[in-house]
A protein has these predicted regions:
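Conserved phosphate-donor/acceptor-positioning beta-strand/loop module used by diverse small-molecule
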Residues: 36-39, 57-89
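Well-ordered, non-membrane alpha-helical segments in soluble/globular domains
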Residues: 16-22, 52-64, 97-108, 136-140
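Surface-exposed, active-site-proximal loop segments in enzymatic domains
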Residues: 48-50, 85-94
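Oxyanion-hole/transition-state-stabilizing segment in secreted/luminal serine hydrolases
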Residues: 40-51
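Generic beta-sheet signal
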Residues: 30-36, 74, 122
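Conserved substrate/cofactor phosphate-moiety recognition/catalytic segment
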Residues: 1-33, 45-46
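NTP-dependent small-molecule kinase module
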Residues: 92-148
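A short acidic, often aromatic-flanked loop/helix-cap motif at beta-alpha or helix-coil junctions
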Residues: 8-17, 82-84, 128-134
Length: 148
């Protein structure tokens, strides 16, 4: 079974709220399955709060929560802590290295909040074959439900 799937990378931190809103609305209303690498509402709720001390979406909670409700599956990529902090040559946004523990804690807290709201959550560790199977099964189940 094949699906029309598009991959959307984060538009980044330096765009306006209106542009973030348009990016999410446009990509959430497509007929295809859209996979986001960092969804702006989540990215801002965590990185904005930890790195800049402010979530730029705070005043738009209802509207952006409505966008979150259109997401079928949230995949939190969570390898072990030692792999996360093995930066190698990867560039990081300002403040990430100094605040890595707070970022991990906030992403984890948000994953639990979304799960408590009944959202489909998969914590994916790319080093674990079990985690890969769980993610593939979760995606397959959601796609199967949408086809029925």
């Amino acid at each position: 079974m094949y699906y029309d799937i598009e991959y959307q990378h984060s538009p980044g931190k330096d765009i306006t709220l209106d542009d973030m809103h348009d990016f999410m609305r446009f990509n959430l209303t497509k007929e295809c399955v859209t996979v986001f690498d960092r969804f702006p509402v989540i990215e801002e709720r965590v990185c904005g709060k930890v790195l800049r001390g402010k979530d730029r979406f705070e005043g738009y909670v209802g509207e952006f929560d409505a966008m979150l409700s259109k997401v079928d599956l949230f995949i939190f990529c969570m390898p072990n802590i030692f792999d996360i902090v093995d930066w190698g040559d990867r560039e990081q946004m300002d403040g990430v290295k100094d605040n890595v523990v707070d970022l991990i804690n906030e992403y984890t807290k948000l994953a639990f909040e979304l799960k408590a709201q009944g959202k489909n959550i998969v914590c994916y560790n790319y080093e674990s074959s079990i985690s890969k199977r769980e993610m593939i099964n979760a995606i397959s189940n959601i796609l199967k439900e949408e086809k029925e």
